[in-house]
Amino acid sequence: MTTFHVAGFPRVGAKRELKFAQERYWRGEIAEQDLLEIAQKLREINWKHQAAANADFVAVADFTFYDHILDLQVATGAIPARFGFDSQNLSLNEYFQLARGNQTQFAIEMTKWFDTNYHYLVPEFTKNTEFKANPAHYVQQIREAKALGFKFKPTIVGPLTFLWLGKEKGEAFNRFELLAKLVPVYVEILNALVAEGAEWIQIDEPALAVDLPTEWIEAYKAVYTTLKEKVKAKLLLATYFGSVAEHAPLLKGLPVDGLHIDLVRAPAQLAAFEDYNKVLSVGVIDGRNIWRANLNQVLDVVEPLKAKFGENLWIAPSCSLLHTPYDLEVETQLKANKPELYSWLAFTLQKVQELRVIKTALEQGRGAVQAELDASQAAADARANSKEIHRPEVAERLANLPTDADKRKSPFAERIAKQNAWLNLPLLPTTNIGSFPQTVEIRQARAKFKKGELSVADYEAAMKKEIEFVVRRQEELDLDVLVHGEAERNDMVEYFGELLDGFAFTKFGWVQSYGSRCVKPPVIYGDVVRPEPMTVRWSQYAQSLTNKVMKGMLTGPVTILQWSFVRNDIPRSTVCKQIGVALSDEVLDLEKAGIKVIQIDEPAIREGLPLKRADWDAYLQWAGEAFRLSYMGVQDDTQIHTHMCYSEFNDILPAIAGLDADVITIETSRSDMELLTAFGDFKYPNDIGPGVYDIHSPRVPKAEEIERLLRKALNVVPKERLWVNPDCGLKTRGWPETIAQLEVMMEVTKKLRAELN
């Protein structure tokens, strides 16, 4: 027998049922009991799908109403004291307030779950954090699964990863010191699961795939010795998202009953675990991407392992399936329009069926599943040879780029002099990051146009009306460099994906980003080409309305890559450079059309950093090159802007400077300009526009707040190189606060200008 198991399933449901139920509950349209019943139904459906695929265990304790790390904060009693809630008797309403904030407390901070596009809620630890077990949420799920007759395996994030993912608050201390207090509470939680009949418990320690300090690594032995001694269940220690080969001696010596390793992200690490003498669970189906596996190739890897490990070989997805959409079969439109592409994909329900085939082949031989293996092989062969994917001219163009293709003609000092000569901007020039409010009217017009209820002419007229409105408001505010407002764009990545060859879109390919927010990433399946201009006519129209400078707006190659499902048959770096080269055609067309200030947004450049420091340089090298390729060939007097929004720059500043954008605008208001200090210390050479107010809130900042931030900025950046702008785009704001916020920004800028002049 070969054990097949899953670490977790998507929580939101095939049609985002959980999202819609949560939002109705928050609006007071359904009662708590209704939400609980919908959630229970979704869990039951998930378990039935796993059982139907012949899984030996169904995953329990993986379901959450918002986030699994928030659930763990509740289960360990580690919720922030500032809320004043009792973790032992937390209501569902209070649970949601932790995630979303309330009148007196801001929400728990959110950040990316390792290098995925899922966000978790960051635990807040203080020196005096006291832990207290409350496993009710997990116990409830086990009882439901038992009542339905399923054999189950709970999955819970382990104590070291849980601590690692948190942040210290208040008095200075090292959160590692809390480990001794946390482990006994884990023992209590795990024993509550054992009392419900859990024979195996999966404990996830993905932190093992990052650069952990030595004391953290060394703690694994003591922690797992304690857990094994005091918990009467078999423990499966799971790692994923990267290689843990360097820790193989430690992991193989831990007193656990099995290990799970990710062979999709790190196939080479298998060699380090082939002599393991307990259960080895191998993640052989990609839990993070949507491509169908070549099952013959997977069997080539696992059949020798079966011969060696026998019943101790387990098979699984590489990680939780939370990161993949639910079911390919509902994509009837994709199947009709792109049948070949459809045949290359596998969503969650298809992935568990792939594991069923592998399990059957290992138990009964390949002949027992020959038809499925043949279909898998045919899809793999078709994909390898498809004309739709492989366009020789794209590879040729990349191969023949001159060695200095990604370099500007002249250094910044010479370029900026030429730019200033024609731009003729005042000191502290003002601009916006790009988008303006997406009103109900804009969204309705776009929806009607997509459904065919609005003609091309009527849709374009509606968008032009909106663009004119945005231009006039900016003129009234007396901003210096204007934007067209992006009314025609649904999303900063999807918009470009729809206009570039090599991209496709699903209708129901939603994955959870956080809480009730889901995203539907584009699918990059083939070589990327820009068949025709994408933004030129909109920017040209906007420029025709005003004598002020109009800025063109594009999304950069790294962000498009990061926020998509990316093909896995060529390196990500190659895909990224293809996108950069395709965007360069757009940049040159904008320049030709008289748009000579062009912003290329890269909010996701930091997100792409590999988990291990040793791999950073290689990534930053190709990401930087792809960005620079996106503006290759522009004239010195064309001004390239970029925008970035996140809070940690210090460790990648040389790479940011290496992008060689003439102007960088960054999100800094919420960190009180702290970020700028790093730019100052580094002596960042080009122009900078630090955000002077937070666009995530409808609040209108006071003049003195913006003035204080700008004066702080002037202490770091020479006045000749300082721009003034909001933190980010204004898409999610309403018009009244947008105008009021920008009025304050302009008032303060003019006051300081007069003073500096």
Swiss-Prot record:
Enzyme Commission (EC) number: 2.1.1.14
Looking up InterPro entries in the UniProt record yields: Cbl-indep_Met_Synth_N (IPR013215), Cobalamin-indep_Met_synthase (IPR006276), Met_Synth_C/arc (IPR002629), UROD/MetE-like_sf (IPR038071)
Which leading EC class covers this enzyme?
transferase
Q: Which residues form the active site?
A: H696
Catalysed reaction per UniProt?
Answer: 5-methyltetrahydropteroyltri-L-glutamate + L-homocysteine = tetrahydropteroyltri-L-glutamate + L-methionine
Source organism's superkingdom?
Answer: Bacteria
Name the keywords, alphabetized: Amino-acid biosynthesis, Metal-binding, Methionine biosynthesis, Methyltransferase, Repeat, Transferase, Zinc
Q: Where does Zn(2+) bind?
A: H643, C645, E667, C728
Annotated L-methionine binding sites: I433, G434, S435, E486, D601
Q: Per UniProt, where does L-homocysteine bind?
A: I433, G434, S435, E486, D601
Q: How is the cofactor bound?
A: Binds 1 zinc ion per subunit.
Cofactor needs: Zn(2+)
GO MF annotations, alphabetized:
5-methyltetrahydropteroyltriglutamate-homocysteine S-methyltransferase activity; zinc ion binding
Q: Say yes or no: keyword Metal-binding present.
A: yes
Q: Which residues bind 5-methyltetrahydropteroyltri-L-glutamate?
A: R16, E17, L18, K19, K112, R517, C518, W563, E607
> Pathway, per UniProt?
Amino-acid biosynthesis; L-methionine biosynthesis via de novo pathway; L-methionine from L-homocysteine (MetE route): step 1/1
Any single GO BP term: methylation
Look up keyword Transferase and say if it applies. yes
Q: Identify its protein family.
A: Belongs to the vitamin-B12 independent methionine synthase family.
Quote the function comment for this protein.
Answer: Catalyzes the transfer of a methyl group from 5-methyltetrahydrofolate to homocysteine resulting in methionine formation.
Name assigned to this protein: 5-methyltetrahydropteroyltriglutamate--homocysteine methyltransferase
